[in-house]
């Protein structure tokens, strides 16, 4: 069973115990890892459970259409050099899965959290991440996450609500650039991959035109006013001569 953190309220301590019991039962009955049910039970008992549970953690939130799990593992591995890390590396990336990951983070003060794109604002509101990692956006599983423009807005909301956080963002994807651009501290990275097939129209106005050195914006119609950021940001970190 998971040890109850001392900083939790009485209600959340009950929720923690119930969630741990639900997870244990799920695994004992062969109904799965319990990565979701434990968090769901805890949240039903204490709606403020995630906020209380996450308070002692310094967290990194990783999101995007592709590469979330791999990147989260890489972040976890890097953070482990400084001590134990809580992480949902098995892909339970909605709110309940994040809760379970933190519940299992014995002796950890850091967390590497994979988060579903549409859950970023809600999770970030409770976790208060120090770093967001925004990978890419594309039309994947639209029945689950909705139109790509709606997803971009969710990521923009998530980052904008935490101006003190650092956003590590893929500057090759115009949709990710739009989602991250308002934050004061953005680290632009480029991997050289052909992201952006779903970003012919830029969410803040204009159309995306592509060239050998990246992308830039052009008016979608005569007289259209373009946003301040009109082209691919210059990356601070990038990969060269690497087959991806």
Predicted regions and their residues:
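Phosphate-binding loop of NTP-binding sites
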Residues: 2-211, 221, 225, 229
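Long, charge-rich boundary regions
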Residues: 223-244
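Gly/Thr-rich phosphate-binding beta-strand-loop-beta motif of the actin/hexokinase/Hsp70
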Residues: 214
